[in-house]
Amino acid sequence: MEKLIEIKDFSVKFETGRAVAYALNGVNLTIGKGEALGLVGESGAGKTTTALGMLNLIPQPAGKVTGGDILYEGKSVFKMSQKELMDMRGDKVAMIFQNPLTSLNPVFTVGEQIGMVLQKHKHLSKKQAIEEAGKLLEVVGIAKYRVNDFPHQFSGGMRQRVGIAAALACNPALLIADEPTTALDVTIQAQILELMKELLVKFDSSLLMITHNLGIIAEICNNVAVMYAGTIVEYGSVEEVFTNPSHPYTIGLFGSIPKLTGPRERLASIPGAVANPEHLPSGCPFHERCGVASGRCSQNASQMFQIGEHHYVACHKAGEVER
């Protein structure tokens, strides 16, 4: 598969007057053309920071890239000129944000906001851009005449559809969806996911789906990467990772999913708390919460190694955890 995005040993820290938080610690990840990759992990794992790095949007001045690189079609996003970055954002790589209410400007109509993307990247006149915005609204299931409505006149699910229309306006090569259904109820979530699946085929875009919901990964993605404390701990095809989770953290995530069939049991949970990025433990960042960790785990983190045809894990004890 041809590489679209390549993340190489990427590390980021955030400095404040009080402390330093190590958000990403040697992330390695590849997104191929036509691939739908799920990035899953608890809140604070570094998922959104990884996505922002792809767009060279790490918040400044607190955020600092301390190592590694991110390549888009072979070129470092950190060596692109400001013009190249502006041309890439929204045109070649687009993002759907978690909360559609805060990602849309309340003082502009939805048509104007979608139209701005088209004016910038496709060089359309304002009138042409608004007309095209109306067509895009129809693609995501919103009546064309609502192009002149404001964000507050839409429901949460409709606002998220507007966000999807804006992201797809220029037919991007990569669509980043940062927990796009978190703020929506379950029935609307299903509609949005079904819409995204249809549009990914229609527009032939790659996808990075950021979520903590493993069900969404199973529904829409080909491959999945599991992130913990700013590192990738397991990666593989959805089929292999879901049928044979091998990192203790991944196994813990699957174990914490409520089961709808069989006898009622106490809901399992992962002991302890998420590693503090200001005081990361030595060795494997998960060893303090791991039931099979040894002295080796507290001293040296495992490198990623292959355990299946399309399955990789970073754990000295892979395969020793009871499922």
Please give the residue ranges for each predicted region.
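P-loop NTP-binding/switch modules centered on Walker-like glycine-rich loops
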Residues: I176, P180, L184-R266
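Conserved ABC transporter NBD signature motif
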Residues: V65-S76
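A short, proline-enriched helix->beta-strand linker immediately N-terminal to the Walker B motif
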Residues: A169-A173
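Conserved ABC ATPase "signature" region
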Residues: K75-S76, M116, K127-Y145, F254-G255
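Short catalytic/signature loops enriched in Gly
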Residues: V147, S237-R323
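Conserved ABC ATPase signature
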Residues: D149-F154, M158
